[in-house]
Amino acid sequence: MSTAVNTIRCSLLLLGLVGIYTVWISSFRNGLFLRNEEFAGKGQLPGTPNATLRTHFTGIDTLDKALGIFVVFYWPVCQGNLRSLSLIAFPAAVGVGEMWILFALQFSQSNSPTRAMGKMAMFGMGLMLVGPGIFLPIYCSLDLSSTHRLDDSPSSAAEGHLCRNLRSCLLGGYYILVILLALPSPAVVSYGSKQGIIALLQGWPLLVSAMLWLTHLCGKDRTADFQATLSTARTSIYISAMACATISHLVPLLISLLADSSDICPGKVFVPHLAWPSRRVTSVEEGLLRFFQWDYGLGSLALLLWAVGLHIQRRQQISQGINYLRLIPEALFLSVMMSPCGAAALYLYRHNSTNCASKTGDKSGSG
């Protein structure tokens, strides 16, 4: 493994340690988690005094209590009481979906659909339960040492079927639920229904994986040249991931830049607050703003470093040089213009194109 890739792996591990402090430890020290537990214990929802917390979701007491805590935690995000929180929550929600689907493409390279979908489900639950700011840097660091072995694995019709259904299943099992959360309450969606949607979202990776499994069981691949359709499916996913990440990044950024209010200036929305031990939050909304700034920021940066690492790794495997003086400023520029998630999708698209060109060259040479 090259020095550059090793440096990226070490940087990812360092990001994971930073995430443990800024996302978890800091949230304990600044009072966010304590306030969350207080609201859950009283059966109240922060910022909505006329609504009560649901106590029944699944009928299993332990699971219902855990889901109630998650509902209280995410409730201010979908109510829009703090505009800066809404602006950072939009790219964060889209970013989590794009993080998942970009890794799902890597998992689908396994010849076993069951194994691939199992990895998708576990990876997604890791994102939800641990948080992308902690889970993703550590996972990406470990993954860089093994993912390259999948690049030359033979494609299968099952892999093509998974890739063609990834986007539609993610839309139905995740993004539609996120859109429903953005609808006003109680005018359009009742308080109880919105709490149920938040609870359901905690297991969206399992839901999306189950939808993929059903499409795999019910669908039959009638395409003779699945290699061509697989390449098309991958390309469309990378392009849509770039588009979604870029739009969700630029829209809040432009709103923040053009707004007259200093409360939603870019520095207060997108720049993480320093996690000083003595700095307490005055509300759950303020604590969530800090939480998402660090969690989404570190997670998206880890995704970009992982994608760049794969790009470097593959180019070195096929004996192509890397111009680091060009690569570093290019990655920084793309991060500003497209978001780190969008830039990661672009580098993964280049990585996939390099793999396809390499395989085509190998087949031509062997023919």
UniProtKB/Swiss-Prot annotation:
| Membrane spanning residue stretches | 8-28, 57-77, 85-105, 120-140, 169-189, 197-217, 239-259, 292-312, 327-347
Glycosylation sites (chain numbering): 50, 352
Q: How does it sit in the membrane?
A: Multi-pass membrane protein
Keywords assigned by UniProt, alphabetized: Glycoprotein, Isomerase, Membrane, Transmembrane, Transmembrane helix
Predominant subcellular localization, coarse grouping: membrane
Q: In which pathway does it act?
A: Secondary metabolite biosynthesis; terpenoid biosynthesis; Mycotoxin biosynthesis
Instruction: State the top-level EC class.
Output: isomerase
What subcellular compartments does it reside in?
A: Membrane
A GO BP annotation: terpenoid biosynthetic process
Superkingdom per UniProt: Eukaryota
Give one GO molecular function term. Answer: isomerase activity
EC number from the UniProt entry = 5.4.99.-
- For this UniProt entry, what's an example GO CC term? membrane
> What does this protein do, in the record's words?
Terpene cyclase; part of the gene cluster that mediates the biosynthesis of the neurotoxin verrucosidin, a methylated alpha-pyrone polyketide that inhibits oxidative phosphorylation in mitochondria and thereby causes neurological diseases. The carbon backbone of verrucosidin is synthesized by the HR-PKS verA, and further modified by the other verrucodidin cluster enzymes.
* Family membership: Belongs to the membrane-bound ascI terpene cyclase family.
Official protein name in the record? Terpene cyclase verU1
Q: What is the gene name? A: verU1
